[in-house]
Amino acid sequence: MNTKFIFISGGVASSLGKGIIASSLAKLLQARGLRVTIQKFDPYINIDPGTLNPYEHGECYVTEDGAETDLDLGHYERFLGVHTSQANNVTTGRIYHTVITREREGAYLGKTVQIVPHITDEIKRRMLLLGQTGDYDVILTEIGGTVGDMESQPFVEAVRQLQWELPEEDCMTIHLTLIPYLHAAQELKTKPTQHSVQMLQKAGVKPDVIVCRTEHPLSQDLRRKIALFCNVRPGHVIQSIDAWSIYQVPLNMHEEHLDELAVRKLQIENFNAPDLGRWKAFLERLAHPAHEVQIMLVGKYVELQDAYKSIQEAFVHAGAANDCKVRVKTIQSEHINADNVAELLAGADGILVAPGFGERGLEGKIHAVRYAREKGIPFLGICLGMQMCVVEFARNVLGWKDAVSTEVNTQTKHPVIDMMEDQKKTTIKGGTMRLGAYACQLEAGSLAAGLYGTTEISERHRHRYEFNSKYLEDFTKAGLKATGRNPQTGLVEVVELPGHPFFIGVQFHPEYKSTPENPHPLFKGLVKAALDNKK
C-alpha cells in the first residue's frame, strides 16, 4: 500500500482545534491497525518556537531528538503514544532559510528564486518526507493559520499541487470551520463556512470533508445546506460539537464516521474497526473520579493556560490513574512573598513549581519551595523549579543567604546553579540549549527509582544551567540528596529530600512524556502523595 496523505486546513477563525481533530482522526486510524504520524506546518517566520514568548505562542514542546516545536506536537504524541521529531514540525522560517541557503550555495544555477516553484517545492518536499521512510501508512498534515491569511497561501498552493501529483486514492483534504451560534436569533449560521470553503476552492483546493466546530448539534437540513453550497456530499459534512474533554473527541469523530470516510476515500482495505478499549477505559476513569485533590501550579506564565499545556495534561492523565480529579490552581510566582505565601498556597494538597527562564518571579518560587518543604506538602519541581529547590535549601538550611543561580547574579559567592560549561561560549539563543532525550541513572532505593520502577531512565531536557557539583557534598551532608545523574557527564538530574512525604526536583521535563494510556510516574506519584496528604 502506498503511503496515504491527509491535509487538514482551518477557516473562519483560529484556535478551532485543528490539532485535536488531526490527533483524533490519527488515533482512530491507529486503532484500526495503521501506522500513523502527524506533522504541523506553521506559517510564522521564526525558524522554530524555541525563542517565542509563551504568552504569544504557548508552550514550546520538545521532542526526543531535541526539536523545539509547536505545542500541537504534544497533542499528537499524547493521542498516539508515539514519538515525533524535527521532521514533524516545519515553519515558513525554516522553509525560507533552506531555500535561501541553497540559493547562496548556487544550487539554483542563477535562476530567479520565487515563491512558485522554489518555496512551494520545498514545502512539498517536506510534506512528503516522512512518507519516504516507509515507516507510515498514513501521514496527516495540519496546515497552521486560517485559509485566506497571506502567510498560509504558499502552503495551500503546495496542497493544491499535491492533489494533482499524488494518485487520487492517496490524498484527502479536510477543512475545519466554525458554525457560529447567534443567541439573539437562536440559530446557527453557515455563511462564514460557505465563504471559507469558497476561499479554499478559489485557491484550487476542494475539500473532501468539512468538519464543523459548533456549540449545538447540526440538523440534517443544515448539513445538506452546507453540502450544497460547499460542493461536498451531505454525508461528508460532520459536526465537532464542544466536548467535555479533548480526549472525548476521537469517540465523537468515530460516531460521525470521520475515520470511515477517510478509509473509503483513501481506499484502505482489510483493516478492522478501531480498537478503543484502553482509550474508553481511561475516559471512564476520567469521567467518574472517586477522589479530588488540589495542586498549586506556581509559575510566571500562568495567565495563559497553554504556557504549561503538557503539565496540565499530565495531571489529567495522573488523576485518572489515581481515580482522582486533579484541580490545578495556578499561582503567579511574582505575587508570592514571605508574608502571603501561606495565604496563597492555603488548601494545597500538592505543589508544583514550573519551569521557566529569567529573573522575574524567582523569589516567589523560592518561597513556594520553602513552604512545601517546611509544611510537608508533596512537591515536584521541574527544570527551573528544581533549581529553585537547590537555591532555597542553600539559603534556608545551609545558611548561604546570597545563594542563587548565575542566570540572575554572576558575582554571587555561592553559585549553586551555574551555566553548563558547553553553554558558556554560546551567543546564539535559538536551538542551542541542552535539548532532547538524555539518559539518567537513578540511585537504587531512592524515591525516583521507586516511582519509575527502574534505575535507568531517559527524559527530555531544555536548559542551559545545572546544579553546581562542587557544592554536592555540602547539600548531601545537610540532607538534600542527588539521586539521579547523567551517566556520561555526572550532571545532577534529580534531587530529593529523604524524610519528607514527597519532595523531588528534576532537571528534565517529565510532562513531555505523559500520555493518557501511560501517565508519567512522577505525576502519578505526586497525585498519589497529594491524596495521602489530604487524608
What are these regions (language model features)?
Residues 304-307, 320-324, 338-341, 360-364, ...:
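Extended hydrophobic-aromatic, low-complexity segments
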Residues 56-64, 243-247, 353, 374-380, ...:
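Short beta-alpha connecting loops at secondary-structure transitions
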Residues 13-19, 23-27, 31, 344-439, ...:
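Cysteine-nucleophile active-site neighborhood
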Residues 230, 262-270, 397-401, 526-535:
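Short, hydrophobic alpha-helical segments
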Residues 1-327, 333-350, 357-358, 365-371, ...:
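Flexible phosphate-sensing "switch/lid" loops adjacent to ATP/NTP-binding sites
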Residues 10, 40, 214, 241, ...:
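Active-site proximal loops enriched in glycine and acidic residues that flank catalytic Cys/His/Asp
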Residues 435, 439, 443-535:
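C-terminal and late-domain segments of enzyme folds
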